[in-house]
C-alpha cells in the first residue's frame, strides 16, 4: 500500500498579527512538515468578519516570510470557500445528519452550556435558526502523536454542535474540516487550546465519509498570570527586527537543540539545521514562556 505524501498546514485567523504563541504553532508545524519531506501549506481562516482586523492577513504573511517560514503553493482564504461550505451543509441536510435549531443562547446557558438536542425532532425551518450536526456516532477519544490517547468530556463529545451560525456565518469546525480535506492535509500540528474541538472535527470527518488526519497539539505559551498568550490578551506582535533570537527562543520552548554559534548563521541556515535536528518526541506536553522577550529583543 502506498504511503500518502505528508501535507501539513498553518491556519491563522486574521484577528491580529502573529505573536510568540502563534510562532510556536507555525514553527512546530513547519519543522514537522519539512523534517518529513512534506508540504507546508498556509490557510487564512477569515470566516468571522466581526473578529477580523483590516490588513492582518497580509501582515501575517509578511511575518511568516520575515521569519523564514516559506509555504508551498498558494495561500487558501476561507472567505473564498463559501460555496464548498454550502455544499457540505447541503450534503449533511440531505442525509438527515443536521437540523435547524432556534434555541437562544440563554436556554443553553441554563442547561450548563451543553445543548440537549431540544430541536432535533421539531423540524424547524431555516429562518432565524442555527444548524446543528446530528451526533449519530460521537467520537469519545483520539490519539495525539505527542500526548498519546486523549479522552473527551462525554457530554461535550455527544453534543449536537453548531455547524452554521444563526447570523449566517459558517462555524469553525465545519470550515476547518472541509478545507483540511480539500487540501489533503495528513497531519495537523497546532496549539493545545484546540484539543477540545478535535473530537467534534473527527466526528464530522466520519459523517462525510472522509479519513481524518493525524493530530499533534503543541504546548501553549502563557503569560506571567498563567493565561494563554493571545491576541485577546493583547500579546505583542512578533518583533520586526532580526528574527533569529526569537526563533532560537521558540526552538528552546519546543526543547529543540540549537548550536551555540547560531548568531553566525543566517535565518535560512538556522531553520535548515532545526529541520535536520527536529525531534517531536522531545517537545514537552506542557510548557510556559514569558513573552517579555518581544520587548527586550526589538
Swiss-Prot record:
It comes from the Bacteria. One of its GO terms (cellular component) is cytosol. The keyword Metal-binding applies. Its cofactor is Zn(2+). Its EC number is 6.1.1.-. A motif ('HIGH' region) lies at residues 12-22. Keywords: Aminoacyl-tRNA synthetase, ATP-binding, Ligase, Metal-binding, Nucleotide-binding, Zinc. Zn(2+) binds at residues 101, 103, 115, 119. NCBIfam families: PRK05710.1-1, PRK05710.1-3, queuosine_YadB. Belongs to the class-I aminoacyl-tRNA synthetase family. GluQ subfamily. Catalyzes the tRNA-independent activation of glutamate in presence of ATP and the subsequent transfer of glutamate onto a tRNA(Asp). Glutamate is transferred on the 2-amino-5-(4,5-dihydroxy-2-cyclopenten-1-yl) moiety of the queuosine in the wobble position of the QUC anticodon. This is Glutamyl-Q tRNA(Asp) synthetase. It comes from Cronobacter sakazakii (strain ATCC BAA-894) (Enterobacter sakazakii). The lineage of its organism: Bacteria, Pseudomonadati, Pseudomonadota, Gammaproteobacteria, Enterobacterales.
Amino acid at each position: 500500500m502506498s504511503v500518502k505524501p505528508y501535507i501539513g498546514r498553518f491556519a491563522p485567523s486574521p484577528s491580529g498579527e502573529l505573536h510568540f504563541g502563534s510562532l510556536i504553532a507555525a514553527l512546530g508545524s513547519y519543522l514537522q512538515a519539512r523534517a518529513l519531506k512534506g508540504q507546508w501549506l498556509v490557510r487564512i481562516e477569515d470566516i468571522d468578519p466581526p473578529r477580523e482586523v483590516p490588513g492582518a492577513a497580509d501582515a501575517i504573511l509578511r511575518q511568516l516570510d520575515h521569519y523564514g517560514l516559506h509555504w508551498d503553493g498558494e495561500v487558501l482564504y476561507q472567505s473564498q470557500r463559501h460555496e464548498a461550505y454550502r455544499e457540505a451543509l447541503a450534503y449533511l441536510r440531505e442525509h438527515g445528519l443536521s437540523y435547524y435549531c432556534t434555541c437562544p443562547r440563554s436556554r443553553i446557558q441554563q442547561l450548563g452550556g451543553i445543548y440537549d438536542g431540544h430541536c432535533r425532532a421539531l423540524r424547524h425551518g431555516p429562518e432565524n435558526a442555527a444548524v446543528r450536526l446530528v451526533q449519530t456516532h460521537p467520537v469519545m477519544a483520539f490519539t495525539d502523536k505527542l500526548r498519546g490517547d486523549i479522552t473527551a468530556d462525554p457530554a461535550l463529545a455527544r453534543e449536537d454542535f453548531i455547524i452554521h451560525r444563526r447570523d449566517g456565518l459558517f462555524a469553525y469546525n465545519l470550515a476547518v474540516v472541509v478545507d483540511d480535506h480539500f487540501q489533503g492535509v495528513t497531519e495537523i500540528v497546532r496549539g493545545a487550546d484546540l484539543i477540545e474541538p478535535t473530537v467534534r472535527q473527527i466526528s464530522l470527518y466520519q459523517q462525510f465519509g472522509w479519513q481524518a488526519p493525524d493530530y499533534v497539539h503543541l504546548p501553549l505559551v502563557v503569560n506571567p498570570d498563567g493565561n494563554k498568550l493571545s491576541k485577546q490578551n493583547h500579546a505583542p506582535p512578533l518583533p520586526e527586527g532580526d528574527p533569529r533570537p526569537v526563533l532560537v527562543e521558540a526552538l528552546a520552548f519546543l526543547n529543540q537543540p540549537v548550536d551555540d554559534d547560531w548568531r553566525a548563521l543566517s535565518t535560512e541556515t538556522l531553520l535548515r539545521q532545526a529541520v535536520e535536528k527536529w525531534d517531536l518526541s522531545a517537545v514537552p506536553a506542557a510548557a510556559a514562556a514569558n513573552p517579555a522577550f518581544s520587548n527586550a529583543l526589538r
